[in-house]
Curated annotation (Swiss-Prot):
GO terms for cellular component: cytosol. Monomer. The keyword Protease applies. This is Prolyl oligopeptidase A. PANTHER family: PROLYL ENDOPEPTIDASE. It comes from Amanita bisporigera (Destroying angel). The lineage of its organism: Eukaryota, Fungi, Dikarya, Basidiomycota, Agaricomycotina. InterPro entries: AB_hydrolase_fold (IPR029058), Pept_S9_AS (IPR002471), Pept_S9A_N (IPR023302), Peptidase_S9_cat (IPR001375), Peptidase_S9A (IPR002470), Prolyl_oligopep/macrocyclase (IPR051167). GO terms for molecular function: oligopeptidase activity; serine-type endopeptidase activity. The active site is at 606 (charge relay system), 690 (charge relay system), 726 (charge relay system). Belongs to the peptidase S9A family. SUPFAM superfamilies: alpha/beta-Hydrolases, Peptidase/esterase 'gauge' domain. The gene is POPA. Housekeeping prolyl oligopeptidase (POP) that behaves like a conventional POP by cleaving peptide bonds on the C-terminal side of prolyl residues within peptides that are up to approximately 30 amino acids long. It is an enzyme of class 3 (hydrolase).
Length: 761
């Protein structure tokens, strides 16, 4: 990293800014107390507290929990109000154009070999609404050295809607290679409908249209949610999960908010009606549990997973498909029948199962079990590395394994043999994230490498080639609108309030100085054992370039960066650690001159939206320059009552439990808005079809913010996206407009200066 000169003097800044093409912009003029009004009711909820007994909690915006004409009018007024503010940004259109240019480059996945002996891959020319599936014309591995587009289009979801709101949510090819089963979600809903088509009938331009899809078979499976598709070896049908149909007709998908109950695993036979599907598993005594069924690659076994919540703990049952007729009377080998750990079946060699688990191994290990000799129990195959998190395992060549570890949040890729011995490390010099795709019987695997300044490199390892040629770069993404090499990332460590060391990535354009003047985007999550790994974002890099800003990504507790121990340190009564870690990150950035005081815009989505709102409520006035909370969980007393919310109790606690209520109530964003403090410019983003974190969280919090602090000298806004959900399946145009709005909001509310080019002062 370069050393930089001391900051230029204050009296020279304006002149230098003009000389280098920058334009100083003051924050957009804001007139308080002009918000659309929201009716306040006298609704009160009663809870039990371990320390206070009965507690009555007013909920004046209870009516915003349900869709109604009144709710729709209020949200429309809010959206119009917010739109007026955002459109007053003189840089808004220029920022959108810059984002569009930086996003317009070919994006692709690693190829995968299907049983029809063709190669398939995901591909987007740049600004297509939805990514398409392409395939080779024969069994030859595609050569992209001359062109980004080779082969033919196999499945183009853009043909399913005129506005890009129909998206592919799941898929699987039959073992015979003749059928393609796929789920389609509308407007970002978690609900999908599964269809089936012949692989000889592509959904491609020229063959089909939005109104005409003749290549699809008559099979139509509705009410599918949180499901995968897994074919049996005979290719006669597949397993999937669905919910009862009551109240979830297509027109209501994404609008209904009732809790998800009574999930069921079914088996569907091709060419039959959904009403004839075979019920395989349900649990009427535990209606909130969810399931997954996956057939092993050799087709011998089906694995049944049971999850009662979002904790990394599940049941694992195995059935031999050769000895069982598919149905409710299948004989299951309940190899893991208590919720004590996570058990993930990697693959099998005959009756020998390979399982990734965190049983007595917070960073995960691999064990084996001979299902024909279960009395022998689990045998350790690859032990836990206490300093590296085992994130992914793939079997290839029948006798080799590709393992991805994360050491201090940086990916490491290794090859092991079938005795559990490490053979080699690949891509040793790469710093970033890694994912692997493979087939158990093939002699190769593909690894996709990404990072803060790496848009995507697909590499191939082929054991049949000479040793020095086994590892090679197969395909590299090339960005047109900006140069990723102009940016650099570093990792630093800082102390949280309790002395815990927290890692944080800092990204900048190479011409941006660490002299205490740079604005910053600080992104975080901190929950559900989910790691925030190095990622590539052309819009964020463009923002960094145009505004001389930095990106900071602290890997706070509650996530999965260091295994279950790290996750456990940020859940339930320890949630305060998550917020403390995030606030401490901002203070570290300012103290060490990575960022300017009062110019750090914090951002997060879903659980990260909760993080942002909670930190705004808790931090000292002036800590943050702006706050952008996306689809956040903001009413922590009500979250279990809606859709899949009950599953989050494992992280947040149960508000109906008197002990849990006491700590939940102290940090629920809706119930802890400070009355005597100036809050930073704040924008909440939600979507009308979000049936994961229902929009009532953002609706109620926005109404309460605006009522409690009507004279706040900074805006407190709500942005509502129409025909969109929690984020999955969102079209490229919607993502682009959202990025322009949220980062434009950060720039206009903090008064940032647009830089037409960077000056290396």
């Amino acid at each position: 990293m370069h050393r930089f000169l001391q900051p230029v003097r204050e009296r020279l800044r304006s002149a230098l800014a003009r000389y280098f093409g920058s334009r100083i912009m003051s924050s957009t003029q804001w007139t308080p107390n002009m918000y659309p009004s929201a009716r306040r009711s006298d609704h009160i909820d009663t809870y039990r507290s371990e320390t206070r007994g009965e507690v009555k909690v007013p909920d004046p915006y209870h009516w915003l929990e349900e869709y109604s004409e009144e709710t729709d009018k209020w949200t429309s007024d809010q959206e119009e109000f917010t739109r007026t503010y955002l459109d007053s940004n003189p840089d808004r259109k220029k920022l959108e154009d810059a984002f569009r240019k930086s996003m317009d480059y070919p994006k692709f996945s690693a190829p995968f070999l299907n049983d029809d002996k063709r190669w398939y891959w995901f591909y987007n020319t740049g600004l297509q609404a939805q990514t398409v599936i392409c395939r080779s014309k024969d069994e030859t591995l595609p050569d992209f050295s001359e062109s980004d587009y080779v082969g033919e289009t196999f499945f183009d979801p853009n043909l399913l809607s005129s506005d890009g709101t129909a998206s592919l949510s799941m898929y699987d090819f039959s073992h015979c290679g003749k059928y393609f089963a796929y789920g389609i979600s509308l407007s970002g809903s978690d609900f999908s409908t599964i269809y089936v088509r012949s692989t000889s009938s592509p959904l491609a331009p020229g063959n089909n249209s939005i109104r005409n899809d003749d290549g699809r078979l008559p099979d139509e499976l509705r009410y599918v949610k949180f499901s995968s598709i897994s074919w049996t070896k005979d290719s006669k049908g597949f397993f999937y999960q669905r919910y009862p149909g009551t109240g979830t007709v297509n027109g209501q998908n994404g609008i209904q908010t009732q809790g998800d109950r009574d999930a069921m695993i079914y088996y569907h036979r091709i060419g039959t009606s959904q009403s004839d599907d075979i019920l395989v598993h349900e649990d009427q005594e535990h209606p909130d549990w969810v399931f997954g069924a996956e057939v092993t690659e050799d087709g011998k076994y089906v694995a049944l997973y049971t999850m009662k919540d979002t904790s990394r703990k599940n049941l694992l049952w195995i059935a031999d498909l050769g000895q069982n007729e598919v149905g409710r009377n299948m004989k299951w080998n309940k190899i893991c029948n208590v919720f004590d750990s996570e058990y993930d079946l990697i693959g099998n060699d005959g009756s020998l199962l390979y399982i990734r688990t965190n049983k007595a191994a917070p960073q995960y290990k691999i064990v084996t079990l001979d299902i024909e000799k279960p009395e022998l129990g689990f045998k350790e195959f690859i032990p836990e590395d206490p300093k590296a998190y085992l994130s992914q395992v793939k079997i290839f060549n029948k006798d080799r394994l590709a393992l991805v570890y994360k050491r201090n949040v940086i990916g490491e890729l290794y090859v092991y043999n079938n005795t559990g011995s490490r053979l080699m490390r690949l891509a040793r010099d790469f710093v970033g994230s890694m994912t692997v795709t493979a087939r158990e019987t093939e002699p190769w695997f593909f690894a996709t490498l990404t990072g803060f300044n790496t848009p995507g490199i697909v590499c191939r390892y082929n054991i049949q080639r000479p040793e020095e040629q086994r590892w090679s770069v197969y395909r590299t993404a090339k960005v047109k609108g900006l140069n990723p090499n102009d940016f650099e990332a570093r990792q630093v460590w800082y102390d949280s309030y309790d002395g815990t060391k927290i890692p944080m990535f800092i990204v900048r354009h190479k011409n941006t100085q660490f002299n205490g003047t740079a604005p910053a985007i600080q992104y975080g999550y901190g929950g559900f054992n989910i790691s925030i790994n190095p990622f590539f974002s052309p819009t964020i890099l463009t923002f960094l370039q145009k505004y001389g800003a930095i990106l900071a990504v602290p890997n706070i507790r509650g996530g999965g960066e260091f295994g279950e121990t790290w996750h456990d340190a940020g859940i339930r009564e320890k949630r305060a650690n998550v917020y403390d870690d995030f606030i401490a990150a901002t203070q570290f950035l300012v103290k060490n001159k990575y960022a300017a005081g009062g110019k750090v815009a914090i951002n997060g989505g879903s659980n990260g939206g909760l993080l942002v709102a909670a930190c705004v409520n808790r931090a000292r006035e002036g800590t943050f320059g702006a706050a952008i909370a996306e689809v956040g969980v903001l009413d922590l007393l009500k979250f279990p009552k809606f859709t899949i919310g009950k599953a989050w109790i494992s992280d947040y606690g149960d508000p109906e439990d008197p002990r849990d209520f006491d700590y939940i109530y102290t940090h629920s964003p809706l119930h802890n808005i400070p009355k005597n403090m100036v809050l930073p410019p704040t924008m909440l983003l939600t979507a009308d079809h979000d049936d994961r974190v229902v929009p009532m969280h953002s609706f109620k919090y926005a109404a309460m913010l605006q009522y409690t602090l009507p004279h706040n000298r900074h805006p407190l806004l709500l942005r509502v996206d129409k025909k969109a959900g929690h984020g999955g399946g969102k079209s490229t145009e919607k993502r682009l407009q959202e990025a322009a709005d949220k980062w434009g909001f950060a720039a206009q509310s903090m008064g940032l200066a647009w830089k037409d080019r960077q000056a290396n002062l």
